[in-house]
Design a protein with these regions (language model features):
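Short, surface-exposed "cap/lid" segments of acyl-processing enzymes
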Residues: 1-49
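C-terminal catalytic histidine-bearing segment of alpha/beta-hydrolase fold enzymes
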Residues: 153, 160-203
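Short beta-strand immediately N-terminal to the catalytic nucleophile in serine-hydrolase-like folds
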Residues: 93-95, 118, 139
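Conserved alpha/beta-hydrolase "acid-adjacent" motif
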Residues: 145-151
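Alpha/beta-hydrolase active-site loop
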Residues: 65-85
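Short beta-strand/loop motif that positions the catalytic acidic residue
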Residues: 132, 137-144
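A conserved short beta-strand
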Residues: 111-122
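Gly/Ala-rich beta-loop-alpha elbow adjacent to hydrolase catalytic centers
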Residues: 94-99, 103
Length: 203
């Protein structure tokens, strides 16, 4: 079935999958980090229809790879492409794990209006790159052993102290892959997009 992008959406959503700290393996659409984001994209399309355009971002390689920041080139291109195609339409970012780190760095751009960070792999105070006008929501499972809920909570605390509209939501017993508490992860994502859409319509 061919999915047609809406001609005049009110909001654009970039979905940023996870990865790992160091790997030059090619990023493929059927790897687990990509697969776990497709239900988010599908539920957003189903709920909001033509009001929202959704793009699943694909990187070239699977890893962040130190100072190479490997995914950023492809994420920035995706942001540039969608803002060029839909000028003036605000962008919401949804990123899991490494994708949450990508999202924090992309959120330095003024075209970004909101960021949902799901169990983000935030390093070196990535959240400090987020510009003050971005609404930030971060979810983190308390049983996550891959990334650090306390660091996410610290980042949100710093953003709040800066005056940013930022919210931290702990998921009790939640793990890193988001395979538990599915309705909570998905429900919060839909609420996030709904609020972002309302904000876009009242700008």
């Amino acid at each position: 079935m061919l999915l047609r992008a809406p001609s005049s959406p009110a909001l654009a959503v970039l979905v940023l999958p996870g990865g790992t700290d160091s790997s030059y393996k090619p990023f493929i659409p059927l790897q687990p980090s990509a697969l776990r984001m497709y239900p988010f994209s599908a539920s957003i399309r189903a709920r909001f229809g033509s009001s929202v355009v959704v793009r699943d971002v694909r990187y070239r390689v699977y890893g962040w790879n130190g100072q190479q920041n490997s995914p950023m080139l492809y994420a920035r291109k995706a942001l540039d492409d969608i803002t060029a195609r839909y000028p003036g339409v605000p962008v919401a970012l949804i990123g899991h794990s490494m994708g949450g780190r990508v999202g924090a760095q992309l959120a330095a751009e003024r075209s970004v209006g909101s960021l949902l960070a799901l169990a983000p792999w935030w390093q070196f105070a990535d959240w400090r790159r987020i510009h003050d006008g971005v609404r930030v929501v971060a979810l983190h499972g308390t049983a996550d052993t891959r990334t650090y809920a306390h660091r996410t909570e610290k980042g949100i605390g710093e953003l709040c102290a800066r005056g940013v509209d930022a919210t931290y939501i702990p998921i009790p017993g939640g793990g890193h892959p988001m395979l538990d508490h599915v309705l909570t992860w998905q429900g919060e994502a839909l609420r996030f997009v709904g609020r972002s859409l309302d904000d876009a319509r009242t700008r």
